[in-house]
Amino acid sequence: MKILLVNMPCSSIRPPLGVSLLKSLLGRDGHEVTVFNANIDFANRVGSRYYHYLAEVAPVEVLLGEYLFADVLFEGRSTEPYLDFLATDFDDECPALARELLAKAKLQVEPHLHRCLEFVEADDYEFVGFTSSFTQHMASLSLARMIKERRPQVITAFGGANCEDEMGLALHNSFPFVDLVFCGEADVSLPQAVAALTAGESLVGIRGVISRNPKRGTSRYTSLSPERIQNLDLLPYPDYDDFFEQYASMPSGSRTAGVPMETSRGCWWGEKHHCTFCGLNGLSMAFRAKSPERALAELDYLQHRYEVEDIQMVDNILDMRYVKTFLPMLAERPVRPALFYETKANLTWDQLLVFQSAGIRAIQAGIESLDTRVLKLMDKGTTGVRAVELLRQCREAGIWPHWNILYGFPGEPPDAYEAMAEKVEWLAHLDPPNVCVQFRLDRFSPLYLRADELGLTAVRPARAYQLLYALPEERVRQLAYYFDFSYGDGRCPDSYTAGLREAVADWQRRPHGDLTHERVGDELRIVDSRSGGRRELALAGAEADLYRACDRATPLVKLVEELGPRLGADRVGELLAEWVERRVMLELDGRFLALAVDAAAAKCWRRRRKPSWRKVLDESLRPARPRVAVAGGLFSS
């Protein structure tokens, strides 16, 4: 069968893992498969900088990408109420520059869709599949309808994060020009469905596939939960050839954010403790990982075939067994790519050194707050002082930590944010959070599934869905991934987080000097330039040993036990209090943590450049309060 897999706007300009893997799976069965990255054509039309704003910077729940295609999909529906909504509710996040961008981008929608239709009609494709995640829905649906009107014999199919569970069923029920919907992972279901179609057999019985009753046109399915592959080593390598061929049309200087690769699926932490705000993995949290040998072979293949320096691991969480297997194997290589991984915050220094030697240059370690009480509400399984310790250790190991401060959790103590705001100046020499924002309510998260129990009320689709989708209210609820809500106790988190948000914004805007320590002769010299001046503190003997003993967050009783015989218990307490007063020591969660960074590591860090995926093309386009984005779904981009 001749198959086209389409990656529409407004997905990021990077190789799409989901459809590229499906291309390899279908190709292995003898089918002729092409991946059409239509997002590249649209980016060329609106300009790469503006497209970057749409795909990477704009708050995803505002659905800017959906707005662009809304009046094509729902002909005659006015989008003026949506623009009014942007102007009133999201004035900070979507400034005037963004609205100017939308007007320009809107003019490119129809030419873009006609170009896409030309691409489809240039070959005799029998099956056209769309990956639809987050803000790709309306663009994909608009093109699918055009294809069906021109070539009704073509089979149209949808998959991706927007098609999980009841979202997929609502999609199929709402748009009759969509023939098939694949819910969840499609490694098994898509090849099975294509084989059945090729043989002229029924799709009934294939789990995770929604098809149409040929007589009634109604939706039919065996189960919305697909069969999931258990041994990831059986998967082929993703085929990114089409992406790089099409990417060559981008203006010189445009960059992609590394080549994506997966070494695992699911979340081993989420199997035990599902972070309350996390909607990743849909309804399946089952953790599966590739063998170290397979992971290494795939990484070698991708690095050499596509001649890339950056590999972005899309795993929800690193398989910690890799610390003793895959990563040491990688460290032995003379040339290693720069890697990004997501992991947990309770890493040890020895583990960070393994990361460093393996070429991991950036991590997202699941730091979402610096207050243990709030972290417990998130079910994160870590503490505030451990998060600060990791930030300092990342600086010393030369690893870039991506992290966030989320607020607005029901039941959180407002004074937690006052305490964090006071500590920002103490941490000014460390890497600031990417964002400080209210958490977003996503489908499948515990806060969504157990909203009443956890203190949320009036849960409804995000306002943008209601303004853009010309569908019945219940159908919109079934389609939505992002939701608005109210608090059962009537709280207003913005009111008690203003000080922290202002402090974080200042932290992000400008450099704040260093806080370092180094051995000079017999002394431990601490140099503090965080406030613009330069202050020095020289420690020797047992006092220096006490400071070094706080390299790991340590309770007072243990410090007295270790240094009391040399300094005296009272003197240990006096020194710690003095260092806390000087802000070179943090007292948090009943433990003491040295804040000064090794001076040699700090010098190396200043010379290093951020990994390419951290670059922002135009800071003037960054919204004041970008929301935290998530991604998921195998049949996704």
Predicted regions span which residues?
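Glycine-rich beta-alpha loop elements in corrinoid/cobalamin-binding modules
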Residues: 2, 9-18, 22-42, 90, ...
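Conserved SAM/AdoMet-binding glycine-rich loop
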Residues: 2-10, 154-157, 292-402, 407-415, ...
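N-terminal [4Fe-4S]-dependent radical SAM core
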Residues: 212-264, 522-539, 579-608
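Canonical Radical SAM [4Fe-4S] cluster-binding loop centered on the CxxxCxxC motif
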Residues: 253-292
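Short amphipathic alpha-helical interaction segments
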Residues: 566-578
